[in-house]
Amino acid sequence: ATDSVYLSATNSALVGGDFYTLVRLPDDCAVMILGDVSGKGIEAASMSALVKTALTAYAWEGAGPARMARSLNSMLMGFSRVETFVTAFIAKIDLKAGRATYCSAGHPPTMVIRPESMPLGGDEARGGEVELLGCQSGVIGAFESMVYETGVFTFAPGDMLFMYTDGTIEARDRTGAFFGEQRLRDLLLSVSGEGVSGICGKVLGELDRFTESALDDDIALVSLEFLRGRS
C-alpha cells in the first residue's frame, strides 16, 4: 500500500524536478525510487523524466541500488554541456524476506516507521519508533569517481517507509526556523497508528500550517506500507 503527494514551487504550472516511482519486479520484489533533480520548472521536469526512465531501466536489468546510482552518475557525467545534479533514494525490496538494500545519494535520510504493536502469544509489545536510514553517499552527477554505498534495513508487516525531498525539512516559518528532521520524526510517530492512507497529506498539511502556506521549494512525499506478501 502506498501514499504520495507532490507540490511544485512553480505556481504557474505543476512542474518541477522531484520524481518518484515504484517498479514492481518478479518474485515479490520491487524497487522504490524518489529523486530530486537540480533546478525548477520545465527544464528540471524534462531532466527528471529522463532520470526516472533511466533508473527504471536499470531496475528491470536487475541492478542493485548502488549500481543504479553509479550507472546514472556515468550517464549524467557524459552530458558535457549539461550540469545536472540528482539526489535520490533507491531501495530494492524483497517482500518475502522482509529485507531491503538501499542507496541514499545526497538525499535526506529516509525514515522507517515502526508503529506500536500489540503482543502476540508470549511476545512483548513493541513501542512505536521512527528509524533513520543512515547509510549516506554523495550526489549523482557531480564527480565521475563518486563512491555509492549500499545500506540494508529489515521490516515487518505494518512497518512503513517514508521518503521525502529536502524541501520538506528545509521549509521555514516566518521567523526563519526550519521545519527540521526532528519535527518530522515526531509528526510521523504521532500519526503512525493510523496506517499509510493519508499520511503524506497530514505531513503536507502540517508543513502548510508551519510555513503559513508559503512553501518555496518543490516537495515530494512518498509513504509505503509493508503488508504480508505484497507492498
Predicted regions and their residues:
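Short, glycine/charged-enriched secondary-structure capping and boundary segments
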Residues: 47-49, 176-179
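Short Ser/Thr-interspersed hydrophobic loop/turn segments at strand-loop and sheet-helix junctions
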Residues: 168
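ABC-family ATPase nucleotide-binding domain "signature/switch" substructure
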Residues: 171, 208
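Cytochrome P450 core scaffold surrounding the K-helix E-X-X-R motif
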Residues: 112-115, 172-178
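Short, charged, surface-exposed loops that flank catalytic or proteolytic processing sites
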Residues: 63-68, 191-200
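… and, occasionally, acidic/histidine-rich disordered N-termini of signaling adaptors
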Residues: 1-162, 209-231
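Divalent-cation-assisted or electrostatically stabilized phosphate/pyrophosphate-binding catalytic cores
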Residues: 156-157, 177-192
